[in-house]
Amino acid sequence: MAVNEVEAKGLNPGLIVLLVIGGLLLTFLVGNFILYTYAQKNLPPKKKKPISKKKMKRERLKQGVAPPGE
């Protein structure tokens, strides 16, 4: 019991603070990663927004029809 108390007093308080903050940060990041992977597997994919007629015309011109003058 006495040996443990001597070792505990020898630890730098700054080191303890760094370890606590580092542990919390690591926990936060791991938790976020787990939530992200869970969401990717289980949530339905986002619905695409409807494309306007103007954009559809532009896409059609890009794909098939050559622009005038070429």
From Swiss-Prot:
Basic residues bias (residue ranges)? 44-60
Query: What InterPro entries is this protein classified in?
Result: S1FA_DNA-bd
Xref: Pfam families: S1FA (PF04689)
The annotated region (Disordered) lies at 44-70
Q: Name one GO molecular function term.
A: DNA binding
Give its localization: Nucleus
Q: Which UniProt keywords apply?
A: DNA-binding, Nucleus, Repressor, Transcription, Transcription regulation
GO cellular component assignments: nucleus
Q: What is a biological process (GO) this protein takes part in?
A: regulation of DNA-templated transcription
Q: Where is this motif: Nuclear localization signal?
A: 44-49
Q: Main localisation, per the record?
A: nucleus
Record family assignment: Belongs to the S1FA transcription factor family.
| The protein's role, per its UniProt record | DNA-binding protein that specifically recognizes a negative element (S1F) within the RPS1 promoter.
The entry's protein name is: DNA-binding protein S1FA
What organism is recorded for this protein? Spinacia oleracea
